[in-house]
């Protein structure tokens, strides 16, 4: 049995017409069945529920942190007590990330937030002021911190806050700083705010 040109054209037209409908049907079936890829492209821990900045009640050297928003993407690092060698390593990494962002570095602010009271030694404060002049210092009460951050407090975690004041990604020292840089570049490239 041979197909005439007329029938062959109809089959091609039907295939072209039905392919998008079939793809739509299959994608809907996969979505509602719960099937989805397991991996994500972000390197930090994506918080199930974003941490709203207004609930944290930060105070920074330039005033309450929520007054800064809407504004810039923010890398917020937490420290419990004085800034140790591990703390300074993460400060150095966040500064290098900011430098490597090049033209987008002005879209990102960095904060070091101390718990309960400013327990940084004079030597730490002097080192921060000389080596990290663009770093903002701040305070937060321990009971205002969400459990996700408290669990990682020993690692001087980073919290990435979007320009609208939502903490969305959490990073710890086990993750190389290049991973935070990759996430930031992706976010800055695709963001219409900040």
Language model segments and positions:
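Thiol-/selenol-based redox modules, centered on thioredoxin-like
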Residues: 154-155, 160-194
